[in-house]
C-alpha cells in the first residue's frame, strides 16, 4: 500500500457521560471533511449535545496494517426484546459460550455494566466458560480502535446494504468493528446492542457465526447498551488488548447477506 493513511478518531461527552464516537482511516486530503462530519455528529446526537469533543489524528505506518474481510450477515426477526435476547443467547451458546456466562453478561449489560449503572465507554471482557469479567477498568473497559473499510470495499458494502434495506451508520460501523474483534486472538464471540436511545437492534458475532443481527435487543428509549467480548480461558490479555486498541485493521472484502430468518425457526 503506497498511499499514506491517518487514523482520525472522535469521542464526545457531556457531564462526563459518553455521547458518541467515530473513527476512520483516511488519506490526508479527506481529513478536513471527516473532522467536520465528526464534530457535526457530536453536536446533533440522540443522546444530547456534546460539551466536550476530542479529535485525535495520527499517521499510520502502512507496513503495520493488517487486512481482514467482513463477516457474512444474517438477520433474525423476533417479536419482542425478550425473544431477541433468547435468540442472542442461543447464538452465543452455539459459538461456544457457556450459557450461564452468556446470561450473566447480558444481564450486566442490561442494568448498566459500569459501576454507577451507566454504559461502559468500551467493552467488557468475559471468560466464556466462567462468566468472570476480566477488564481492569469497569468504567472504560476495552475500546476497539483503528479500523476502517478501504475505499472500494466501502462502496461495495454500501451498495449491498442498500439492496437489503440495511444501509445505515449503525450497521456499517458495527460490521467493521465486529470484523476486527472476531479476528482477535482468544475471542470466541461478541454481544452488542447500542446505547443510542432510538436504535433497538443488536448482534452476536463470531468467527463461526458471522454477524447475526436482531432488530430487537433492547426497548426503545433505553440508553444502556454496550459490548461483551467472550474469551477462551487461555486468552492472553497482554496480546489481545493491544490488538483491539492499537492494531490498524483495514477491511478489504465484503461478506454475503443471507435472507432474513424468523425466531424461533
Curated annotation (Swiss-Prot):
GO BP annotations, alphabetical order: biotin biosynthetic process
Q: Which UniProt keywords apply?
A: ATP-binding, Biotin biosynthesis, Ligase, Magnesium, Nucleotide-binding
Q: What is this protein called?
A: 6-carboxyhexanoate--CoA ligase
Give the catalysed reaction(s), semicolon-separated.
heptanedioate + ATP + CoA = 6-carboxyhexanoyl-CoA + AMP + diphosphate
Q: What is its quaternary makeup?
A: Homodimer.
InterPro entries registered for this protein in UniProt: BioW
Which top EC class applies here?
A: ligase
Cofactor annotation: Mg(2+)
**Which EC number(s) does the record attach to this protein?**
6.2.1.14
**What family is this protein classified in?**
Belongs to the BioW family.
The function of this protein is: Catalyzes the transformation of pimelate into pimeloyl-CoA with concomitant hydrolysis of ATP to AMP.
Gene that encodes it: bioW
GO molecular function term, any single one: 6-carboxyhexanoate-CoA ligase activity
Q: In which pathway does it act?
A: Metabolic intermediate metabolism; pimeloyl-CoA biosynthesis; pimeloyl-CoA from pimelate: step 1/1
Amino acid at each position: 500500500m503506497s498511499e499514506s493513511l491517518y487514523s482520525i478518531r472522535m469521542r464526545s461527552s457531556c457531564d462526563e457521560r459518553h455521547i458518541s464516537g467515530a473513527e476512520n482511516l483516511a488519506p490526508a486530503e479527506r481529513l478536513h471533511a471527516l473532522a467536520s462530519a465528526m464534530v457535526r455528529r457530536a453536536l446533533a446526537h440522540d443522546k444530547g449535545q456534546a460539551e466536550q469533543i476530542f479529535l485525535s489524528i495520527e499517521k499510520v505506518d502502512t507496513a503495520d496494517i493488517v487486512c481482514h474481510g467482513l463477516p457474512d450477515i444474517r438477520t433474525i426477526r423476533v417479536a419482542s426484546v425478550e425473544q431477541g435476547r433468547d435468540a442472542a443467547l442461543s447464538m452465543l451458546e452455539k459459538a461456544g459460550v457457556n450459557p450461564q456466562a452468556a446470561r450473566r453478561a447480558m444481564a450486566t449489560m442490561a442494568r448498566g455494566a459500569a459501576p454507577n449503572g451507566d454504559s461502559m465507554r468500551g467493552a467488557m471482557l468475559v471468560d466464556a466458560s466462567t462468566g468472570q469479567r476480566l477488564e481492569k477498568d469497569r468504567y472504560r473497559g476495552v475500546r476497539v480502535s483503528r479500523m476502517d473499510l478501504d475505499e472500494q470495499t466501502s462502496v461495495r458494502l454500501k451498495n449491498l446494504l442498500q439492496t437489503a434495506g440495511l444501509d445505515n451508520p449503525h450497521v456499517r460501523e458495527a460490521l467493521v468493528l465486529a470484523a476486527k474483534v472476531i479476528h482477535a486472538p482468544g475471542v470466541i464471540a461478541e454481544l452488542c446492542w447500542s446505547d443510542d436511545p432510538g436504535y433497538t437492534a443488536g448482534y452476536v458475532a463470531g468467527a463461526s457465526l458471522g454477524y447475526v443481527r436482531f432488530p430487537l435487543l433492547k426497548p426503545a428509549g433505553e440508553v444502556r447498551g454496550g459490548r461483551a467480548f467472550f474469551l477462551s480461558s487461555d486468552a492472553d490479555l497482554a496480546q489481545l488488548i493491544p490488538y483491539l486498541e492499537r492494531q490498524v485493521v483495514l477491511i478489504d472484502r465484503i461478506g454475503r447477506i443471507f435472507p432474513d430468518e424468523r425466531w424461533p425457526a
